[in-house]
Each structure stands twice: as C-alpha cells, then as structure tokens.
C-alpha cells in the first residue's frame, strides 16, 4: 500500500466522467488492481442529488460465467489484468468531505460496493414500489424516497431533539420500524454493521472475481490472459 500525489490541471473533476472515461487516460494512473484497491481522492465538481453532496463512488465487480453472482457484472474473462483496462477501475472519494466523521464511513460504504454489495434500501424503476433489491434476505429494505420526504417534513415540524431521534429510524417494506445500522445504507444511521448474507457475497467476490487483490489473482498464468484492452461494461455505485 502507498500514497501517490498526482498533479492535475483540473481543480474539480466530475466523478461520473472520471469513473466512466474509457479512453485509457485515467486508467494509466492505476496501480495493479490485482494487487491493490485503487482509491482516488479529489474534489468532485459541484452537484448535488436528493441525498446531498456526493461523498464517494465505486466501480462494481465482475464475476465470471462459471461463478456468476446475481447482481454483479457478468464477464467472459475469469482473469483480467491492468493492461486489459481502459477505464480507471477504482474508488473515488470527495476531498471536500475528507473529515473524519465522513471519510471512514464513506470509504467503508464504497468498499462494500467494490466487493459486490448493493444499497439496503429499495432500488427499482418506480419510486412508489418498495422491493428488496440487494440480493440479501437478512437486510431489511425500505423506500428511501418516502424517508426523504418524511425527513423534509420533520425538519420543519419537529423539535431538534425529536428530529435527531427519528432520523435514524426506517420503515421497512412490510411496515416494520427499525434502526439503520447497515454500512450499505445512507445517512442518517449508525452504519457500522454487515449481515451474514452480505458477508457471503463479499466472500464470493474474494474467491472468484477478477481485479481483486487476492491470492487467486496474484497467481495468474500467462496462458490465462487476454492480450490488450477488453470491452468491459462499466457500472458505478455511490
């Protein structure tokens, strides 16, 4: 592991553009992904979502056909090397939010994506539908859009003490109430726990996925490799 300081012409960088650039320009900055997890820190270009400022973004892993994991990117290549990449397979963190109260939580969350975990809240085509979309049965799901609307109301109608108390609560898809503690949720919550199903997904990625720093990928033989750039799907998560 190490730290490398890179001088760039841009002060702010659009994280979506950086992570999806397939020209090879940013891929040239990578250390070997089969030996390191690359984490870039730079100031994200201005822009907010319904959840506020983007704190981090990560690429989502691949799994080969013979070890496909539902919800990941399928690839025909069981082994992929740095020379095959044209985009910067990595994690990006927003340096504007690089203070301790956020950075550790953000890095943990993005590492979860990097190792195959999805958000615990409902993600589908319709905001009105609440579904379990993270492929983990032991993580309660909830409608985040409903939560954000309620928090907007609570901010103007509850006392500060009441607001702090309710913001860590979620209402699950089946109507149950629970405290948010999972790393793969967004603020607000404790965000310091994984579940058994999430652990199983991460272990599957560590055992089978290319571009992960594991003993499997450190022992790649020349006969297993594809020469030159590969056209790979680029999927990012925040």
Name each model-derived stretch.
Residues 6-20, 53-85, 139-171:
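Charged, glycine/proline-rich intrinsically disordered loops and linkers
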Residues 9, 14, 21, 32, ...:
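Acidic-enriched, low-complexity/disordered segments with a strong bias for Aspartate over Glutamate
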Residues 22, 34, 38, 73-76, ...:
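Detector for Asparagine
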Residues 163-238:
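Extracellular low-complexity, Gly/Ser/Thr-rich intrinsically disordered linkers
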Residues 1-37, 41-45, 207-214, 218-238:
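Propeptide-to-catalytic entry region of secreted or membrane-anchored zinc metalloproteases
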Residues 89-193:
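The catalytic-center signature of Zn2+-dependent metalloproteases
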Residues 51-55, 125-126, 131, 150, ...:
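General "foldedness" signal
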């Amino acid at each position: 592991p190490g730290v490398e300081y890179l001088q760039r012409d841009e002060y702010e960088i659009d994280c979506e553009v950086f992570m999806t650039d397939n020209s090879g320009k940013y891929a040239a900055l990578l250390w070997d992904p089969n030996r390191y997890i690359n984490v870039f820190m730079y100031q994200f270009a201005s822009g907010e979502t319904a959840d506020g400022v983007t704190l981090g973004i990560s690429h989502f892993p691949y799994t080969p056909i013979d070890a496909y994991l539902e919800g990941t990117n399928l690839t025909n290549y069981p082994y992929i090397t740095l020379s095959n990449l044209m985009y910067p397979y990595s994690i990006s963190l927003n340096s504007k939010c690089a203070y301790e109260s956020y950075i550790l939580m953000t890095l943990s969350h993005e590492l979860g994506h990097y190792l195959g975990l999805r958000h615990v809240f409902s993600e589908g085509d319709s905001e009105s539908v609440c579904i379990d979309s993270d492929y983990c049965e032991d993580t309660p799901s909830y409608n985040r859009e409903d939560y954000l609307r309620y928090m907007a109301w609570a901010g103007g109608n509850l006392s500060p003490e009441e607001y702090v108390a309710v913001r860590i609560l979620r209402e699950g898809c089946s109507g149950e109430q629970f405290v948010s503690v999972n790393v793969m949720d967004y603020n607000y919550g404790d965000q310091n726990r994984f579940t058994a199903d999430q652990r199983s997904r991460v272990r599957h990625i560590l055992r089978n996925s290319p571009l992960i720093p594991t003993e499997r990928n450190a022992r790649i033989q020349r006969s297993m490799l594809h020469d030159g750039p590969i056209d790979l799907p680029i999927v990012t998560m925040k």
